[in-house]
């Protein structure tokens, strides 16, 4: 390792603490309280405390440390992670039928994330503000308004980017984790008996003693690992090593100490179950703890918001969501983006959730079902990658998958009990997003197939135009072409109605590759089809935003000189008609029409000056 790398590792590790671990790092605010609140038919009993602590500890070890940190993070696409990346990797070396199944699993996982992302900011911030109940019980009616005010400020500043305040995230979260560790260790020293719960015997004993109820109680235990997907999703920002170092050196020890510290407190003072996290702190430290807890939960919420922006961009670029405005808030960091529509849709949803559920304990009933569902899908997809891409031994992969699912499926099944009490919310939101993504992808494919049914050969048409050319006009015309060997509709209609052709015609195709970035050397491919026709294929990764001006610059370097303000861009605008279909497909067609009407137009999507664009309409039945 070079000196530079040695210097950068601590900085990247600190940055990872500030972003990646915000969600899982604020789980101690509410996890143990929900486990022992009495909802499962038992209160703060010694065996229950030991059982829950043992389950939480071994879940952190097995699911986070072994499954995600050690195994899942091996599956990267040019350093990038996330459920859609895993879906893409899993489908590379499989049959078409198997790929379709894997795509559906990946989209379900992505949809689950959208469902859970509405709950995370609400439960995190509310659980911090609820410290007011300990400091000043008379202010408990202000918890909901203050939570909304805090989150409103967070969503408002999104359009300005988080580059400046983001520099504060890491030191604040480091202070947070150190406080977790200190408060927990202080309580453990006062009652070291609690360390017996490190023995997995207590987890087994918990199931044997409480039987069926213990299985349902797993729905509360899973709160301790919510946010685990962020470790994999944010891998591209910081790299594997900093995330792993941060987990084992700071985050895991701090979480374990704090959970066991809360357990030690509850063994001596069962009445502290009202809010064991804040009651760990001495009375004089309650107000500072409330402030730092609020800041930590805001940072956790910011990480989730940034995550949903990144997932949305990836889904748009891969063709699963309609084009929408994506604003880059940093000239230095391509990952810092702002999507206005998603931002305000998420804000309204979060406010509705806070007003409806009123307390973090009520929200806890809705939390976890989407997380555990994603965990099941991640296990299946990552095992597929291990077998098909890495060519690991079939028996070993099978045993590993069984081991993962033996944890994931019971956790998911236990959370199904939450559907009536609130779990319906993330499931409903996830179902909506899955419907939207599959509708856009399938109907877009149907539309393109119909548009390409005319069957005219591009080469034959170009040859015919060169032999018997129409009237030529000076300048360059660019026709946006979705497929390489298909005549663009705009070109057909321009010849049909205007009966003219520019002196130079460029057929431009912008395509998204199965990689986060494409090197500038491979950005454009130029092919001269005839003396006056050129084909340009510009490739972008799914983390990049296509820019026609940049394409022209690269073309100039390759010998094809183009000037934006001397070029006319011809695009087709499709007016869609829904043909004869079964009723359910008609509904899907109407949803697609709605999505298309609200999609970002191509000139805005590719940053083409509006005064250089000519749109030619065509009617297509789908």
UniProtKB/Swiss-Prot annotation:
Task performed by this protein: Responsible for the low-affinity transport of potassium into the cell. Likely operates as a K(+):H(+) symporter.
Protein name: Low affinity potassium transport system protein Kup
Catalytic activity: K(+)(in) + H(+)(in) = K(+)(out) + H(+)(out)
PANTHER family, per database record: LOW AFFINITY POTASSIUM TRANSPORT SYSTEM PROTEIN KUP, OSMOTIC STRESS POTASSIUM TRANSPORTER
InterPro entries (UniProt xref): K+_transporter, K_trans_C, K_trans_N, Kup
Keywords for this protein: Cell inner membrane, Cell membrane, Ion transport, Membrane, Potassium, Potassium transport, Symport, Transmembrane, Transmembrane helix, Transport
Organism: Klebsiella pneumoniae (strain 342)
Gene (UniProt): kup
Pfam families given in the database record: K_trans, K_trans_C
NCBIfam families hit by this protein: kup, PRK10745.1
Compartments it resides in: Cell inner membrane
Spans through the membrane: 9-29, 49-69, 101-121, 137-157, 163-183, 213-233, 247-267, 276-296, 337-357, 363-383, 395-415, 419-439
Record membrane topology: Multi-pass membrane protein
GO MF term (any one): potassium ion transmembrane transporter activity
Main location: membrane
Recorded family membership: Belongs to the HAK/KUP transporter (TC 2.A.72) family.
GO cellular component, one term: plasma membrane
